[in-house]
Amino acid sequence: MKTKAIVTLAIGAAFKKRWERLCADNWREYAQKHGCDLVILDQPIDYSERAARRSPAWQKCLILGDPIVKKYDQVAWFDGDIFFNPLEAPNIFDEVPIEKVGAVNSFEDPSSVENKVALERLWKWLRPSPDVPVAGEYKTPQDVYLKYGPPVTPLPAMLNAGVLVASARHHAEIWREVYDNYDDRGNPSYYENVPLSYELVRRDLVHWLDAKFNHLWAWSKFLHYPFLGGPGSRSLRDKILRRLTKYAGNHYEQRIAVACATAALLNCYCLHFGGYAAEMEWVDLKSAATGRVGNLGVR
């Protein structure tokens, strides 16, 4: 038996089908390359009424107590909407001391300066009008912790719980405490993310990973590909022209989207589609495996 494993939850037929269709081969290649097992949990760990009332995302806090998972010395949790760079993604276990939890700082993805710009553009795009803020809008990790409220207090850093490296022996009890003692409080609590981050950061248990291990596709979009923002940002003239070219058989818009998403994967180790899972279809993993974006054929 191997001593390390990649773990995720794939609960629900639609979610599991999407993971198997889009991610399975990519994940198996990464696990095989780095000598890890791959553990896919497709049933809830907790069947209680409380568990049924909240997102399955909370159940990642229970994986370290799972009979299969806890046999490993160290495991890496990945949300099921992530692709590995097939050429350059290194062994994530080499980065993290076993007594620490490996994670990416949410506000340093891809860097602190670029993250600030990406957030500003995101809020601007989401606001119904320039002077009306979005519910849950924030600028700093302190803002997010404050919005969650007591017993959480502001801290200078926040992790993204989409990618976590941990050890059952060292961390199962703390993760279980988060599951038992916290609950959803709406945006921007992001389910388990804020309380789990709070408890791990305040105890100085986090080993900060290179942001490339958990790069949000949303940030690539808002930093580099704003033209992929969506139909709401287009003029009527633009919408008509796009429709006409599509009917003419020139699917240039789709080809450009594929090129952008594939390039984003090549620029990081793990590309995370949190909130944009439908756009996982844009990634061309065959091209990514060559290190080049395929021919667009744009006319």
Predicted regions and their residues:
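N-terminal anchoring/stem segment of glycosyltransferases
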Residues: M1-Y72, A168-R169, A277, V283, ...
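Short His-Asn-centered micro-motif
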Residues: T8-A10, D42, F78-G80, P86, ...
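Short, surface-exposed amphipathic charged segments that create phosphate/polyanion-binding patches used
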Residues: S55-W58, K116-L122, L223-G229
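A glycosyltransferase accessory/donor-loop signature
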Residues: A76, V96, K100, P150, ...
